[in-house]
């Protein structure tokens, strides 16, 4: 999978491709924050050669002004849920799996980013409180937060119980609370 971005009239656009399970090349393009459109190509046109496909994609979209998104412009978003114990319970594990899957789909299909992982454990401020943290990397902080809220609400994943915090991707300091 390869993803490129470009700014056009103060709007951020994305273009990405991947190879489907059916051996089709899927090219997905759109304005960041929207689902965009897909185009299917037959992978056999590329002689099963990933480099040839990557060159085709890069050539096509770089001519239109698309480039890699610099990591200095990325954001970490952490979605936090309270847990009742350090080990968590069945609900916590279910919530972790469902929220991670749905958020990864939501962020990916809208060109916003992806889920990078999760952790479950004690809070930094109070060792007697426990949380599930889901870490997301996004290209636009505000659109990412809005997409996360909308997704968790739509799929009824304890939306009213979350906190969302943010920090620049390249910054190694504290997160700043954005929503609770």
Predicted feature residues:
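Short, low-order "capping/linker" segments at domain edges
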Residues: 170-180
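Surface-exposed, low-hydrophobicity interaction/linker segments
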Residues: 85-119
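A short, exposed loop/beta-hairpin motif centered on an aromatic-Gly-Thr core
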Residues: 34-48, 132-138
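Short, hydrophobic/aromatic-rich segments at coil-to-beta transitions
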Residues: 1-6
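Conserved short beta-strand edge segments in small beta-sheet-based binding/regulatory domains
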Residues: 154-171
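Surface-exposed beta-loop interaction hotspot
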Residues: 56-98
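A short, charged, amphipathic alpha-helix used as a generic interaction element across diverse proteins
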Residues: 44-62, 145-153
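Short, intrinsically disordered low-complexity segments
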Residues: 107-146
């Amino acid at each position: 999978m390869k993803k490129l971005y470009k700014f056009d009239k103060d709007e951020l656009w994305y273009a990405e491709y991947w190879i489907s399970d059916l051996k089709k090349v899927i090219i997905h393009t759109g304005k960041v924050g929207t689902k965009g459109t897909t185009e299917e190509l037959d992978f056999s046109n590329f002689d099963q050669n990933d480099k040839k496909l990557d060159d085709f994609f890069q050539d096509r979209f770089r001519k239109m002004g698309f480039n890699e998104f610099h990591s200095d412009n990325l954001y970490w978003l952490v979605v936090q849920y309270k847990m009742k114990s350090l080990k968590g319970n069945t609900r916590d594990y279910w919530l972790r799996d469902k929220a991670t899957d749905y958020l990864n789909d939501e962020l990916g299909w809208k060109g916003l980013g992806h889920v990078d992982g999760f952790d479950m454990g004690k809070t930094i401020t109070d060792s007697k409180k426990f949380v599930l943290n889901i870490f997301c990397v996004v290209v636009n902080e505000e659109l990412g937060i809005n997409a996360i809220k909308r997704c968790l609400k739509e799929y009824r994943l304890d939306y009213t119980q979350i906190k969302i915090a943010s920090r620049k991707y390249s910054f190694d300091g504290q997160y700043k609370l954005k929503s609770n």
